[in-house]
Regions:
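Nucleotidyltransferase catalytic core that binds NTPs
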Residues: 1-165
Length: 165
């Protein structure tokens, strides 16, 4: 029995965690297309968070390892994985940037525990199947090209080379 001066105990509502958004990439020669992708990821995450009544988003970005860049792009990166990680981490849009696991993309995904994975327009469609077959439950969306045109670091480097000659 409560005395007249005591107040009833009200349980605190359970605070849900922010929505986890995940982006992966090389980010070698950071440019506006990268910024467009990260802004798109945050906006898509905020829209999903509102629908799910989650208190905002946390954007995690995994940076490709130097050996992965060499294997995929058949050239060494211009910036080291540490430099690329620091550049991306310095962006206000990004809550966390880390270098990916050696030879295991799925470990990097699991480390981030994403609710939403945003792929760039130029990332392989095979990643969606790889994620599904690994049992990743996150929703996967693809960012469109910036202003309907392809913007890639390799294109920028090519333009700079042509300007030098």
């Amino acid at each position: 029995m409560l005395n007249a001066g005591a107040s009833a105990v009200h349980p605190r509502p359970v605070q849900r965690p922010p929505l986890q958004v995940f982006v992966a990439g090389t980010f070698d020669g950071l440019h506006y297309g990268h910024l467009f992708l990260l802004r798109y990821a945050r906006r898509a995450g905020l829209a999903m968070a509102r629908r799910l009544r989650r208190p905002g988003v946390r954007l995690s970005v995994v940076i490709a390892r130097d050996d992965s860049v060499q294997r995929i792009k058949v050239r060494p990166p211009h910036h080291t994985q540490r430099e690329r990680q620091q550049l991306v981490a310095a962006l206000r849009l990004v809550d966390r940037a880390f270098v990916g696991q050696r030879d295991d993309f799925i470990k990097s995904v699991r480390r981030a525990q994403p609710d939403l994975i945003v792929l760039g327009y130029d990332q392989s469609a095979a990643w969606e199947e790889v994620l599904r077959s690994a049992g990743v439950q996150a929703r996967v969306v693809r960012c469109q090209e910036y202003r309907g045109r392809r913007l890639k670091s390799s294109m920028i480097r090519g333009d700079l080379e042509r300007m030098r000659t």
